[in-house]
Each structure stands twice: as structure tokens, then as C-alpha cells.
Amino acid sequence: MLTKATAKLIQSLKDKRNRQESGLFVIEGAKIVAELPASKITVKSLFATRNWLDANEKLFSDVDKVEVTEQQLKQISFLQTPQQVLALAHLPQQEFSVNELQSQFSIVLDTLQDPGNLGTIIRIADWYGIKHIVCSTDSADVFNPKVIQATMGSFLRVNIVYTSLETMLAENKLPVFGAVMNGENLYRTTIPSKGLLMIGNEGSGIDQGLLKYVSNPITIPRQGGAESLNAGIATAVICDAWARQNAS
């Protein structure tokens, strides 16, 4: 049975502070929830319609399942159109070491504010096989319901961590490619298989204090009249250039 207290708790998890205090976050949608058993995420409770429960009776055998009506699901959902099931999950422990980054290509996000952009970038990283995204502590929270939904499940396969970029970059030994307005032409730049791609804030770009760590400032050459590209599109274009150069 869905109690008022539980419904209130779920709705409170739209705020980062409440997620951190409770240690819980929300995952919605049949597709993403179906991927959870194979992930590192620990599910506390499931709230689902009878149709979903009947079709997935073998999933989550050790998890508390609460049957809800479509109307009840609508009351607790963060989606305009709820998708049969909502999972209440425990926030995972952050796992991060600068040494891990030294053997691969990773993305670094400086003060990225928009949840949609973060979700898109996580999905892009997953598409190109990039395993790590390192975010400044003031970037959008990956466990925001909007971010989770925008990733379409990719947050389960990409390790997203929050740390001091100044400290991390000071320890890093790889080349750092920073997306800036007046850098080297992306298509004339050699991007090795191992390195860091830094994407800055949507409005102000990479923080001036971090630019000293950017060994290779790069720019996507403009052909038309658009003023700029959003962070997600810029990340996709640069990741594609990296993938093409390092295709086996």
C-alpha cells in the first residue's frame, strides 16, 4: 500500500538536499528499471501497476513491491506521462581515483548547470564507450530525476563522480582538451586515445582558474551563423572526432 508518508518522501527527492539526507533517489520507466538488476544500484522499493508486476514477476524477487494504480503513480511520478513503474533506490558510493583516468579517455565537466545537458552528455559517453565523467562539485546532480530520465539508462554504465577539478587536474598527467571559443580547429587536432575532454559552463565556459590545465584548447569550426552550440552537442561533435581518429 502506498502511504501518504511514502508519497511525500518520494516527491521530496526532487531536491538534492533531501536525496543526500535520505540516501535515496528515484528511477522511472520500464526500460531503465529493467536494467537495474544487472547494475550496481541497490533498489529499496518498487511502485508499479498490476500489469507491470504481472509481466515482471521474476524481477527483483528480494525487493519490496507496492502495487499502485495509474492515478497513484501519477501522484508520485516526476514524469508528465508515468511509465508503469517507479523505483526507489539507494544512492551509490562514489568511486574515483585519478589513476583510473590515466589509461583512457574521459570527460570533465566544469560547472555544468542544466540537468538535460548532463543527461545528454552521459548518454553520449555511453554511446562512445567512455567510462568516466568527472564533474565539479557545483555541477548538476546526476541523481536529479530530470538527469536520470535524460540518460535513458546510460547512468548505469558510466561512472559519474564529483570532486575538486583543481585538485584532480593538478594530479593528472594526460593531455587536456578544452572546448573554447578561440582554440585550435578541432579537425586539425590530433586527439589521442588517452586524455581528458573538458566542457565548461553553458554561459561562461571553462573557469579561468582551470584554463591553465588545458594543454590543448580546441574549437569546433563554425560554418554558418549560429552563435554557439550547447554543451551536449559540442561534446558529441568532439567525442565523434576522437572516436574517428582512434577507430581500430
Describe the residue ranges of each PLM region.
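Glycine/small-residue-rich loop that forms an oxyanion/phosphate-binding "nest" at active or ligand-binding sites
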Residues: 65-90
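Active-site/ligand-binding-proximal alpha/beta "capping" segment
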Residues: 178-226
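Active-site regions of enzymes building and remodeling cell-envelope glycoconjugates
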Residues: 59-69, 104, 175-176, 190-196, ...
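Amphipathic alpha-helical repeat scaffolds
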Residues: 29, 113-120, 229-232
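RNA substrate-binding interface of SAM-dependent RNA methyltransferases
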Residues: 38, 93-182
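Boundary-proximal intrinsically disordered activation/regulatory segments immediately upstream
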Residues: 1-53, 139-140
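Structured adenosyl-cofactor binding patch, chiefly the S-adenosyl-L-methionine
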Residues: 84, 126-128, 139-156, 208-248
